[in-house]
Amino acid sequence: MALRNLMTKKPFAGILTFRQQLRCVQTFSLPDLSYDYGALEPAISGEIMQLHHQKHHQTYITNYNNALQQLHDAINKGDSPTVAKLQGAIKFNGGGHINHSVFWKNLAPTREGGGEPPKGSLGSAIDTNFGSLEAVIQKMNAEGAALQGSGWVWLGLDKELKRLVIETTANQDPLVIKGPNLVPLLGIDVWEHAYYLQYKNVKPDYLKNIWKVINWKYAAEVYEKECP
């Protein structure tokens, strides 16, 4: 996530308040993809990838940055109602940015290892916690297909219990909403914008085919870092 600082006026000297922690506002920018938009075809079309990345993800970032700036201004003004009102926009758009930033890394072209089963410690953990990789895929597909409305289905690591979990989140809620110790290893976007242009209303087909381009290598790297 690229960051740049927008410097603002310092609050009155000698007053140690939360305002002093907000003398600069961090803003976020659209992350580059490590592959071309068409590189995931036929599992995910280039048209969907371009629209999803350039339009949908960018919109979350733009709205997130705007909400953060408004929050900064409201805190400096002591405008508590506006501070409270902005929490929903920050959660939704910030979550959209967080989730999509993980999602792009969870994908890889087949020629670059997309779809290859996980090995090493993550592969062993999957067998221990779920019995097999196929069981994980079936459970995540079932959870994703059953999710009402928009949301995400996740394979996560519970760092405290040192075990893998499968969870769903609504709208753009990030996985951490389900627990502060949960780390996302793999997230699948089940919003219609992720598949409708190609799969229409047949979400199960999208969920079936996306595994052909899942980047298990990235998931394994996160797992090994968080659960050495």
Curated annotation (Swiss-Prot):
Which keywords, in A-to-Z order, does the entry hold?
Manganese, Metal-binding, Mitochondrion, Oxidoreductase, Transit peptide
Question: Under which name does UniProt file this protein?
Answer: Superoxide dismutase [Mn], mitochondrial
Its family remark reads: Belongs to the iron/manganese superoxide dismutase family.
Q: Required co-factor?
A: Mn(2+)
Binding positions (Mn(2+))? 52, 100, 189, 193
* Subunit and partners: Homotetramer.
Q: What does this protein do?
A: Destroys superoxide anion radicals which are normally produced within the cells and which are toxic to biological systems.
What catalytic reaction does the record list?
2 superoxide + 2 H(+) = H2O2 + O2
An annotated GO cellular component: mitochondrial matrix
Q: What is its EC number?
A: 1.15.1.1
Note the PROSITE patterns from the entry.
SOD_MN
Q: Where is the transit peptide?
A: 1-24
Superkingdom, natural source = Eukaryota
The record's remark on the cofactor is: Binds 1 Mn(2+) ion per subunit.
**Molecular-function annotations in GO:** metal ion binding; superoxide dismutase activity
